[in-house]
């Protein structure tokens, strides 16, 4: 389990694939606390190679930023000993979180996808082995069809109250949502397109962090 994890600005990588390494580094330089390497569809070998590149670039840009692998516990386990990889984010159909913890060790960061109250309650059974949950979608999103109804701002307070671990909002989240989402009690914003398509990903990440922090100080 990670003692210090900054979830305020959490980049989930996506298209365009050729920009992933540069955008990840820029977001890290702007204060993104987490970068999740996700690039679907992608082969395991290509994901591994991409993760190594992202990890090196992020470490150079901001050593405090944590780098996670999407879904593939095996890739995370293979890379963690020698690269700047810190854990994994797993979905409902991926490896059981307890097994992931056994494989990755006590210091790894493990996140789990949720998005409904029953899923949050189920995730609480893993509160001793996961570090946070992702909850969404906030809005309908073209990057991932979860089959779940959008939560909107009104959907998060109940999930935050029910969860035994920090909650990260995801699903067409943008910088301008930071203050409103912070008010719901979430620990941070997971952003895909907003950062990936930003003209200045560093400035975008800085904006998310500052707006989220200012809202929590009110």
From Swiss-Prot:
Q: Which GO terms describe its biological process?
A: thiamine biosynthetic process; thiamine diphosphate biosynthetic process
Alphabetic keyword roster: Magnesium, Metal-binding, Thiamine biosynthesis, Transferase
Q: How is the cofactor bound?
A: Binds 1 Mg(2+) ion per subunit.
What pathway does the UniProt record associate with this protein? Cofactor biosynthesis; thiamine diphosphate biosynthesis; thiamine phosphate from 4-amino-2-methyl-5-diphosphomethylpyrimidine and 4-methyl-5-(2-phosphoethyl)-thiazole: step 1/1
Residues engaged in binding 2-[(2R,5Z)-2-carboxy-4-methylthiazol-5(2H)-ylidene]ethyl phosphate = 141-143
Assigned EC number = 2.5.1.3
Binding annotation for 4-amino-2-methyl-5-(diphosphooxymethyl)pyrimidine: 36-40, 70, 113, 144
What does the UniProt function comment say about this protein? Condenses 4-methyl-5-(beta-hydroxyethyl)thiazole monophosphate (THZ-P) and 2-methyl-4-amino-5-hydroxymethyl pyrimidine pyrophosphate (HMP-PP) to form thiamine monophosphate (TMP).
Q: Which family does it belong to?
A: Belongs to the thiamine-phosphate synthase family.
This chain's protein is named: Thiamine-phosphate synthase
Q: Which organism is it from?
A: Corynebacterium jeikeium (strain K411)
> Source gene?
thiE
